[in-house]
Amino acid sequence: MLINRPRYYPFYIFLLLSHFVYAQNAASGKITDAKTNKEISGVDVFINESNKPAITTTSGNFMVQSDSIIYKLKFLRKNYALETVDITPENATNIFVKLSQEKISDIQEVVIHNERPKYKNKKENPAYAIMQKVWARKRNNGLDKFDTYTYKEYEKIQFDANNLDSAFMNRKIFNKLEFIFEYKDSTASGKIGLPVFLNEAVYDNYGENRPSKKTKRLLVAQKTSGFQDNQIVTLTAKNLYRDINIYDNTLNYFDIGFPSPVGETGFSTYDYNLIDTVSVRGENAFKIRYLPKRTDVLAFQGYLYIDTDSYAVLGATLKSTQKINVNFINGISTELEYDNPDENTFLPRKFVTEIEMTPFSKKKTAKSIVAKRSVDYSEYEFNKPLEDKIFKRTEEEYSDSFTDKDDEYWVKARPDSLSKSEKGIYEMLDKLGQTPKFNRIVKLYETLGSGYYNVKKLGIDIGPIFSVYGKNEVEGDRIRLGARTYFTRNDPWRVQFYTAYGFKDQQVKYGAEARFMFNRVNRFTLGAGTRRDILQLGVQLTNDDGIMARTFASSTIFARGDNASLSSLNQTNLFTSIEPWKNFQIRLDGTMQSIKSANPDGFSLMYYKDGALRKTTNDSHFTLSLIARPGAKFSQTGIDRYEHGTLAPTIVLKYTRGIEGLFGSDFNYNKLQFLFYKPFLVGSWGKLQVNFEAGKNFDTVPLALQNIIPGNQSYSLAQNTFAQLNYYEFVADTYTTLHLEHHFNGKILSFIPLIKKLKLREIAFIRGAYGTLSDASKAINVEGFKYSAPTDHIYYEYGFGIENIGFGNLRIFRVDFNWRGNYLDRPDISTFGVKAGFQVNF
């Protein structure tokens, strides 16, 4: 429910960048025939990626205006080749355009006026015959066919603020920041624009397919305007984009699936219309226009350029519909170019994606951030011998030397030179970084995003601010204060602690942990910590042994029924971890702990040991964890990393060995646990989240060390718990659980009139648990007769939820409706419940 996680950073960055804003909103000039130099009329003039011409000229002169940025004009007239002009403040007037009948044009998105033809069935559509041949000859990325390959990648990400006016400049927030408007562009319509962020990066890519599969993407150089030390801004910039393959059936934007117009299922979503044959970089190509059959679903519109001989995709344009139902997003536009070295493969050439983002409003005139990412792929080399050491991680890769490149390097590295406005971003933000007021604004949003307030002079973060207050039956009102060391985003060590006080039990609680990473390559780390606290155990199966790991200590302010099943925990932990391979971690924990009931009158953890009755469970154990995150991407190289949004799975295998007699431990036991979690895109039907867990205690242990099927008696959303289970209702020596949660992204509700205007999104879920509990495990506990496992039947819950509740682009509320499927004869159960919470995502 809390929103202090890296995946929520886009929400905060939109709020920040909405204050700082580049625009050119008018352009004029003359159009002539390139051969005769005579003026031409009847020319369609298109602004940016618009599907409709802004004007059709009646003379050789033209003038266009727009409420948004004009960065490109396209000119088209029958029997003439398309001409494109990039617009900057310097060339926006007196543009001289020459149209030629003989020029071979690059890929461009234009509209040739024609009605959408109607066919009795798709087989009558000539575009269908073409697409069938595209599917039959579906190409694979050419990199897969070679034994080895290398190529360079230049990436540029730019944020421009849009749709500002003179009144905005006069706001108090810009007091003492007026100098930023020296970089503005004023237009005839009175709007103002301002560049706010620029990031450039150069990568060397290496790959080997045979004899073994290896890849490496090496960051060679990076240059960021003013935000090198701001984790939120840089992470957000990188986190907006995903790699896509136009031949896939589903394209991933923001981890949301959009049907691909080139996918084999495309005709179920799109109408296709063969427009013409055109020349694309010297190749003859079919130009096919596609439109979604329904504009209120997640889909694109645009053009496909298909080679007339090989039926390869030479290029494509993808533009979102006006009714796009994605939070914080007003529009998406992508241009793709491919090279086709042979009849079976393709190679990426250039990808350009623009995303228009607003934190609140969907209106076209709303103040927004236009985020543009362009990637150029070049210098392909194939079957060149590559040494094994190239694929090995080295310490140099994790240093900051890639930020030390001089201006001369960047002039050579860029495929195209920077515009005047792009160069101004570096200068402006360097000045902003020296301005106290700007730094205070950045700190505010960084605090909201990270959950910590940084005291830079001391190198300390205070927080997390979202855990300051809590309430439970034992402690009553609870105040928690914490801090951690934080000097830079790449700190190799961290010390953190917290202290808490309950006004009902009048007890002080605390926790502290120190960690040090010795090697950035294999992330070899040692850590130690201790805590004394009141916790809600039994709400996680595959839990983390770390002292500062997420717990359910006292965050339940509103709950159904009395929650008396809290435990008092004294715990000390030592651990070491290493990543021998990328995204694969081996961790060994040694833990000594004592557990007793924090509320003996309402909740018993008493058990029998050698005929004696005991109330405290003393435990010493070692835990070996194998954690795999294939495909995960991270920012920073320090002790704490920030994860980019991906569909990477999480796979965990844990073995725990309890040792009797070690530091007074009461039990020998062996436990094995497994966890698998992964989100799957299911075409245009949304995203399915799968969470499977299984485990077994091989020995008899008391309740404090048992596997508890996680319940949730709060009214808040809690991932991977059972909403209608009470705490400790099911206890198991052996267990399996499965959680399936499908997000339809509004697919079903979009069919319902009136309701679809609300842009709500539906969720369906089902959860199940099965387990066994031995008689010995029941007998060891004083109140063992109360506990049982879901053995007779698989316990299950089901329900649906509504997410995306809110207004405009601010739709962060979710409500779930849960039903208990069986075991309905038990006392004090709840058969139906409502959970709610905040969920900040796209």
Give residue spans per PLM region:
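Short, ordered, surface-exposed loop/turn motifs in non-cytosolic proteins
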Residues: 25-27, 34-49
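A short, amphipathic beta-strand motif
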Residues: 27-33, 60, 97
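Short Pro-Gly-centered beta-turn/loop motif in secreted/extracellular proteins
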Residues: 37-41, 63-70
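A short, solvent-exposed loop/turn motif at the edges and junctions
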Residues: 47-49, 74-85
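Short, acidic Ser/Thr/Gly-rich low-complexity loop/linker segments typical of extracellular
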Residues: 50-61
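Conserved "repeat-terminator" motif of extracellular CCP/Sushi domains
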Residues: 95-114
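Structured extracytoplasmic
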Residues: 111, 116-285, 291-299, 361, ...
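Exposed, low-structure sequence patches enriched in small/polar residues
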Residues: 256-258, 382, 391-842
